[in-house]
């Protein structure tokens, strides 16, 4: 390393290095949204040898005229990495025998890595792939992605308007418990109406839609049009509308219940403290009863000993 570096070029490549450090292997691996997704393929790079190489890179001290890793492009980072790992000295040497013994336990995971000769160096950026992502960058991006879903920072619960769901209750100045009871009655009423619709005979076309005459035609032409095409029958959408209304009611109820979570936590804590107080009162009462029993027993023993001493004295 000669220490010469173009800082303007490094500033241009900083964003590229940052994106590669944050994304890691997710750019090359397809995102899995299954309930039990497989682990990311980047775990195969966490071998004993690569971790040793990473320790060497982290322990290496840069010169005063050398730029930091964040200012380098991807190519420049790899060049510096290989140059540091090829440096002679005890700090950059890896004992081959010790390494083979340590990697024997991971043979099932890293067969390909063990087959490589010890002189081969990794062809990827060790610091970008193996080090944890920079939290500051994640906060600047405003969120992070987990299994294909974006989670914002800070975690904000979206409102019903943002989710595209109609709000069926006033937003302010109303008791949430009363609103839940009202929504529950609405849900039961809509369910009863849907049940009544299902009990009716099947009518695939039960709504008559009259035709609308063309206003550009003369009255005689409009009458002729209405005579040839008076309208058509179609299916009713009442059942679908009621089902959609039930879904909206349930979502509104869930949203209200989530708003009551702090109140529920406070009431639960109050109940737990009351239960602890009652349990301690019961324990104290039990201790007092046991103490009273022991006192009575001691008094009985004293009386028995007194009687025995009187008997021995009289004899």
From Swiss-Prot:
Coiled coil: none annotated. Residues 25-35 have a biased composition (Polar residues). InterPro entries: Med7/Med21-like, Mediatior_Med7, Mediatior_Med7_sf. Residues 1-36 are annotated as: Disordered. One of its GO terms (biological process) is regulation of transcription by RNA polymerase II. GO terms for molecular function: transcription coregulator activity. Keywords: Activator, Nucleus, Transcription, Transcription regulation. One of its GO terms (cellular component) is mediator complex. It is found in: Nucleus. The keyword Magnesium does not apply. Component of the Mediator complex. Component of the Mediator complex, a coactivator involved in the regulated transcription of nearly all RNA polymerase II-dependent genes. Mediator functions as a bridge to convey information from gene-specific regulatory proteins to the basal RNA polymerase II transcription machinery. Mediator is recruited to promoters by direct interactions with regulatory proteins and serves as a scaffold for the assembly of a functional preinitiation complex with RNA polymerase II and the general transcription factors. Belongs to the Mediator complex subunit 7 family. This is Mediator of RNA polymerase II transcription subunit 7. It comes from Mycosarcoma maydis. The lineage of its organism: Eukaryota, Fungi, Dikarya, Basidiomycota, Ustilaginomycotina.
């Amino acid at each position: 390393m000669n220490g010469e570096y173009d800082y303007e070029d490094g500033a241009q490549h900083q964003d590229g290095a940052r994106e590669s450090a944050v994304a890691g292997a997710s750019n090359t691996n397809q995102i899995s949204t299954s309930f039990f997704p497989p682990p990311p393929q980047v775990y195969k790079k966490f071998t004993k040898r690569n971790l040793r190489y990473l320790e060497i890179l982290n322990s290496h001290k840069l010169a005063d005229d050398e730029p930091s890793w964040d200012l380098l492009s991807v190519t420049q980072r790899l060049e510096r990495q290989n140059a540091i790992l090829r440096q002679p000295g005890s700090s950059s040497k890896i004992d081959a025998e010790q390494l083979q013994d340590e990697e024997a336990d991971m043979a099932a995971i890293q067969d390909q890595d063990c087959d490589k000769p010890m002189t081969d160096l990794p062809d990827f950026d060790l610091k970008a792939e193996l080090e944890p992502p920079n939290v500051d960058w994640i906060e600047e991006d405003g969120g992070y992605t987990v299994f294909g879903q974006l989670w914002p920072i800070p975690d904000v619960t979206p409102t019903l308007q943002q989710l595209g769901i109609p709000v069926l209750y006033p937003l302010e100045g109303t008791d949430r418990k009363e609103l839940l009871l009202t929504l529950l009655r609405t849900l039961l009423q809509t369910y009863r109406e849907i049940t009544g619709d299902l009990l009716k005979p099947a009518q695939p076309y039960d709504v008559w839609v009259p035709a609308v005459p063309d206003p550009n035609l003369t009255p005689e032409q409009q009458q002729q049009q209405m005579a040839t095409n008076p309208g058509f029958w179609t299916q009713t959408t009442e059942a679908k509308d009621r089902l959609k209304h039930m879904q909206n009611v349930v979502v509104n109820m869930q949203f209200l219940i989530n708003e009551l979570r702090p109140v529920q936590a406070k009431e639960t804590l109050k109940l737990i403290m009351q239960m602890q107080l009652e349990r301690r009162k019961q324990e104290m009462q039990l201790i007092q009863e046991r103490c009273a029993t022991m006192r009575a027993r001691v008094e009985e023993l004293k009386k028995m000993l007194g009687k025995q001493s009187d008997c021995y004295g009289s004899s």
